[in-house]
């Protein structure tokens, strides 16, 4: 009788576990798509992002302009479909970011604050985790730029959050940041080189006149 009484229990547990797992997977899917915010504020773990440091062979003001252009100026063609401005008040912007991932695009909504020429800060409003704060710091070094990225990411639900936030979201997030910063570096250095060539031609023209 005991065996008969316990017989259905493993199946019930498996079914319940599968239901919970499916619910968690669905919640994470909708959060990654920016369709819901998983902000329970229970059992939260904080994971550092970065630091990531780059030396960019371009003046600080030019690097800042490259970072700010999609938010405060004309949207570059390379950013079309990746960034959508939802609201703007001076140097504070609310933007939707769409990032291509192997399975499906991830969508986040963030506030972005610009403090020219040394700092840009990002605060997550909606996305795959309840808490992300990031900072770009730009320091001038003899006409070049020391670019440093730092931040933190928070996920809820104790051990589940530590695994999800620290082992799943963080590596993907930092890879996206590294790829983005590589694009900033390339664009800034290309513009700096073009500016240098214009100055050189102007100097040569003045010398011939």
Give the label of every model feature segment:
Residues 62-67, 73, 95, 111, ...:
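Hydrophobic pocket/interface hotspot
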Residues 35-39, 181-209:
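Short, highly charged C-terminal tails/helix-capping segments
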Residues 70-106, 114-117, 201-207:
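Short beta-edge strand/loop motif at the mouth of beta-sheet-based domains
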Residues 123-178, 184-186:
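Beta-strand/loop substructures that line and gate deep hydrophobic ligand-binding cavities in soluble
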Residues 10-90, 208-209:
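Hydrophobic ligand-binding cavity/cleft-lining segments
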Residues 51, 104-109, 130-135:
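Short, surface-exposed coil-to-beta transition loops
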Residues 57-61, 88-89, 113-119, 137-146:
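A short, structured loop/turn motif at beta-sheet edges
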Residues 56, 99-103, 113-115, 128, ...:
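Beta-strand elements of well-folded, non-transmembrane domains
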